[in-house]
């Protein structure tokens, strides 16, 4: 049986994480609307958006370019829950700076929704689950915040920070799965795939393009 593993995300961090775990996915960015719905909490939001992203790719017809006996589509969505406030991607330097002034010296919960869809012979099986990791931030000085924001790294990442880049020095403690902080929990993903009858180790070391046999 040939398998095509699709990452429905343009996140470099998620791609690096999968590659480090021995999986070489096909990357198909989702065009889903990632707007936050009124009254939606972090768990509901990331669950909905991860599913929406996966189905956006599935329904786009893009998978037809990668024929395989079994198609696996993985989509994720991450936000930082800071005292009940949902922080996605700041997009602007000023917003990232404002967020960091609230975040420094405090804890937040990085919430990542994961959606896995497995398609075999036209039959779709899928599952959505949530990963949550408590992150403690260092008490940064104003100068450190300015320098970090000026680096450009915070603008395009959930919660305006990374753990695997410049922001790693500003994380003093993690309670939970550290992979989840990068936007994709490998232990959670493994369990989801097992629930859908996919053996994790069967996905290792696929040739470029995400096809395995």
UniProtKB/Swiss-Prot annotation:
Catalyses which reaction(s): a ribonucleoside 5'-triphosphate + H2O = a ribonucleoside 5'-phosphate + diphosphate + H(+); a 2'-deoxyribonucleoside 5'-triphosphate + H2O = a 2'-deoxyribonucleoside 5'-phosphate + diphosphate + H(+)
Keyword terms: Cytoplasm, Hydrolase, Nucleotide metabolism
Recorded GO CC terms: cytoplasm
Disulfide bonds: none
Cofactor: a divalent metal cation
Record-level GO BP terms: nucleotide metabolic process
First-level EC class: hydrolase
GO molecular function: nucleoside triphosphate diphosphatase activity
UniProt-annotated location(s): Cytoplasm
Homology family: Belongs to the Maf family.
Chain's role: Nucleoside triphosphate pyrophosphatase. May have a dual role in cell division arrest and in preventing the incorporation of modified nucleotides into cellular nucleic acids.
Identification of the protein by name: Nucleoside triphosphate pyrophosphatase
Species this chain originates from: Cutibacterium acnes (strain DSM 16379 / KPA171202) (Propionibacterium acnes)
